[in-house]
Amino acid sequence: MTEDFPKILPLLVEEDTFLYPFMIAPIFLQNNASIKAVAYAKNNKSLVFIACQKDKLNDNEAPYYDVGVIGSVMREANMPNGRVKLLFNGIAKGRILEPAKENEQGFLEAQISPIEYLEYDKENIQAIVEVLKEKVITLANVSSLFPPDLIKALEDNDDPNRIADLIAAALHLKKDQAYFLFANNNTEQRLLDLIDIVIEETKTQKLQKEIKSKVHQKMEQTNKEYFLKEQLKQIQKELGTDKQRDEDLNQYYQKLESIKPFLKEEAFKEIKKQIDRLSRTHADSSDSATLQNYVETMLDVPFGQYEKKALDIKHVKEQLDNDHYSLKRPKERIVEYFATMQLLEMRHKKKPEKKDKTKGTILCFYGPPGVGKTSLANSIAKAIERPLVRIALGGLEDVNELRGHRRTYIGSMPGRIVQGLIEAKKMNPVMVLDEIDKVDRSVRGDPASALLEILDPEQNIAFRDHYANFSIDLSQVIFIATANNIDRIPAPLRDRMEFISVSSYTPSEKEEIAKNYLIPQELEKHALKPSEVDISHECLKLIIEKYTREAGVRDLRRQIATIMRKAALKYLEDNPHKKGRTKKSEDKDKKGGNEENEKRGESKDFCVSITPDNLKEYLERMVFEIDPIDEENKIGIVNGLAWTPVGGDVLKIEAVKIRGKGELKLTGSLGDVMKESAIIAFSVVKVLLDNETLKVPKIPSETDAENKKKKKVLKVYNAYDLHLHVPEGATPKDGPSAGIAMASVMASILCDRAIRSEVAMTGELTLSGEVLPIGGLKEKLIAAFKAGIKTALIPVKNYERDLDEIPTEVRENLNIVAVKNIAEVLEKTLL
């Protein structure tokens, strides 16, 4: 056959796959050029060349592969719609030598040359063929690609290239993969490539078989379950056990009717609608569980259930006094609120038609951590005998946590407010919104905006929960919020609350709280008797001053608990027989009397005495809450007063002057406001020096080169650079209240005048020298008192407005002086 080649043959393009020499395959033609080519070949008894069409084309590239099969047309038949069916017999592989061209008769012709295989080592090839056949048999066991007759044909054939073609044709390879096998004339390489392909195909077929098996098993299991469920339904129907669902539905309808008088029409219709849907829903439907959960949740909301016990102001006072020491002002404000509520209740009994106008009270306790804000709310709930619900808002950033999730979501549930009503089983509980200043905004909404509706007495009568899908009356709920910093609460939300300050405790107040509340409570928690642990007065004072740094008493409780734990351990070490004792053995000991106890070695008079001398054995770490003041009066050091989230503090401010050009340098992690305060203070001091309100000798400049003629005389603030530093540089500081302290230390260093060490001050300074009021006065003065300060300078407006809030102990031991302007400050500060 190769003698007459290369020769020009008609070209046909097969769309789907490669044809092989041994194949007799039907081909369908619809293209006119291809039909003309077949007619020409049949009339002239010519061979034809069939190439496979490419899926992806590059620019200037033929739309078919350059290899294909040479063969003859065995039979031709016309089909409907102008199509032609022919039976093609493949004879040999061929390659297109030059691009095909369209001839005068209107079909493609190409110059074709047969593909000749390279010589090969028969023994080596035979070994590879055997491996290939083994892999094919393995593949045949897990797939239907190789039927038995094809396996037999492979076994009977000795031509390795024919075997490779048979396998490649059966694998239905992708066109590019088939092309490389088809065009390769290296027999050994073709066989090795086929082995890799067969191995990969075997893995794929095994995986598909496993997946199909699992799917089939699951379908069988599903069908089986469905069949069994249908049988079970029929059995239940015969036995009458399916009546349980009907009974549940009847109970839902009955409960809905019982609370109908307390429901708005909207709420009644929504719940009834969902019960009706539940009755029509198949029990095995996924909607059934969702609907049932909704109905049961909504029917659990205590509509119409109110705590009806009348308010008693006397009882409220007693409860607050029993639970909390000091806090006189907050207690008074709380009692005033509930006195108003009690009066409203009394008047509404006479005029029932006005009862619905009673609005829930909204209080917000704010102050440092550990001062008793949340426990005050607990005491209020006890005092008015209503259930307490606590909702932690710290870090809350999803509005749906408050408003509820819509029922379109899987696992949806009502918001925390509605859940709180269900938990309380009353519609008028005390609801504590803890840490309301720590609510965050995110892409999931702004919870603070939802709180506007919840806390507004004019709106919360119709609070709409997304899960419930109807409005709920919250007007009878007593909302109590707690916060550390009310400045972080949005202004519209602040406008809806009444704020009650719960500020820092004085050392003596902490001591009384520890004696009357903390120590008895911790003794009980640790199973110790009051006679077994004795904490002396001096020791308790030392714990408060040296081992805690806080405005409240939370850390003080922890320190006392540490002592109790070590006391409990000491008790067990001294009385080892007490380990694992039973009630029976204890009763026996009692009957045996003291003699038996002494035999067992129990100390009858066990007592751990905690004194300042042995305190380090129980508490190892000292905090030193506030450093004591220096007794020596120094130039360039002043005592400022600062407010922190954990209470007040004495803030020392230092200044030095360096020969320079009058520049001001600030260090100590100061914020923008505090830096501006320093600049204002520097300008005010300059004005005082210019006016000679502050007197200081003028500083001569350096002489000229000949040391004869002096230049002009400089003012002190132009002759020196001023460096102002606020210690603890790693701690950020900000705020305007250090203005007068900064001015004092600048005046001290520039005038070389010492500052009284027993004086501390706080106040904002204006450019005209006036002293403006500041916040956190109580905490600042308590800090001054703890540090041993004798005189505290405060703005006159704070003196007039806030002095009555200062604890009596502080007012009696601290000389509090009101100042109007910087001149008065410097007069009382500089020596």
From Swiss-Prot:
One of its GO terms (molecular function) is serine-type endopeptidase activity. Gene3D superfamilies: 1.10.8.60, 1.20.5.5270, 1.20.58.1480, 3.30.230.10, LON domain-like (2.30.130.40), P-loop containing nucleotide triphosphate hydrolases (3.40.50.300). CDD domains: RecA-like_Lon. Pfam families: AAA, Lon_C, Lon_lid, LON_substr_bdg. Residues 574-605 are annotated as: Disordered. GO terms for cellular component: cytoplasm. Its main location: cytoplasm. One of its GO terms (biological process) is cellular response to heat. ATP binds at G367, P368, P369, G370, V371, G372, K373, T374. SUPFAM superfamilies: P-loop containing nucleoside triphosphate hydrolases, PUA domain-like, Ribosomal protein S5 domain 2-like. Residues 9-202 form the Lon N-terminal domain. Induction: By heat shock. Keywords: ATP-binding, Cytoplasm, Hydrolase, Nucleotide-binding, Protease, Serine protease, Stress response. Residues 632-831 form the Lon proteolytic domain. ATP-dependent serine protease that mediates the selective degradation of mutant and abnormal proteins as well as certain short-lived regulatory proteins. Required for cellular homeostasis and for survival from DNA damage and developmental changes induced by stress. Degrades polypeptides processively to yield small peptide fragments that are 5 to 10 amino acids long. Binds to DNA in a double-stranded, site-specific manner. Belongs to the peptidase S16 family. NCBIfam families: lon (TIGR00763). PANTHER family: LON PROTEASE, LON PROTEASE HOMOLOG, MITOCHONDRIAL. This is Lon protease. It comes from Helicobacter pylori (strain J99 / ATCC 700824). The lineage of its organism: Bacteria, Pseudomonadati, Campylobacterota, Epsilonproteobacteria, Campylobacterales. The gene is lon.
